[in-house]
A protein has these predicted regions:
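Polytopic transmembrane helical bundles with strong interfacial aromatic enrichment
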Residues: 1-143
Length: 143
């Protein structure tokens, strides 16, 4: 099995694993709301833990020679992920901005689900390899 094929299969598994991690993150947020604020530490720590899956998705997409959307979409989610911490930082000075934290979480979940669902078709399609002069056969000299 080729390296690019392994990377495409890994991409699909990583994408669904990321969706599952986001669902766990929602659960931990609910735990903080309904079972006591001390549980928000679990929510915060878990969020910092699984974000690295997005980098793995980008790497797998590039190694797997997958379409542009397969690596660009996780990069977009990385931006949304980074915004989560920014929104929380405004909780005392600008609560209206901090209130965007759960809205952004829904955007992250939606994007993650789209990536995971699209991964099946991306797994089947890869960017065609470019031919280099060294890989092309020498032209025949037919007179």
């Amino acid at each position: 099995m080729s390296t690019s094929r392994v990377a495409r299969i890994a991409y699909r598994w990583l994408a669904w694993l990321f969706v599952a991690c986001v669902v766990v993150q929602f659960f931990l947020a609910g735990l903080g709301v309904f079972a006591g604020a001390s549980n928000f530490e679990l929510h915060r720590n878990w969020g910092y833990t699984f974000g690295y899956l997005l980098i793995a998705l980008v790497v797998a997409a590039l190694v797997g020679r997958m379409p542009r959307a397969a690596w660009a979409a996780p990069l977009g989610v990385i931006v949304l992920f980074a915004l989560q911490s920014v929104f929380v930082a405004f909780r005392t000075s600008a609560p209206v901005i901090a209130a965007l934290h759960p809205v952004n979480a829904v955007a992250i979940f939606t994007a993650a689900l789209w990536i995971a669902r699209s991964s099946a078709s991306w797994q089947r399609s890869s960017v065609p390899e470019t031919k280099t002069p060294a890989s092309e056969p020498a032209p025949s000299k037919a007179a």
